[in-house]
């Protein structure tokens, strides 16, 4: 008998979150393996089965970056150490960016590019 894996429906998105996801999707159209997943209380964009960013309900952005670049990227406007719940800091390589700091496409592109750089490095490492 064939068994199908049950998948939960994705959580509903806020209008702000949906708009941010559309903007992110437009920045990764050149990638062949892109999908959305509900993760970290938001909607994550996965490239090559690895999260690059997750859009929060308030249109803030959780970004996965190279841990070696973490401190330098924290100096960017609107960037903060990511937390999973009150006071539970995530490790190096996880940054939250405020919605105000990614209001224009150039700023959003900066963060998606940073995440894609890490994604490409990790994907290459896993292929070797």
Listing of model-derived features with the role each one plays in the protein:
Residues 1-128:
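Charge-dense, helix-prone N-terminal extensions
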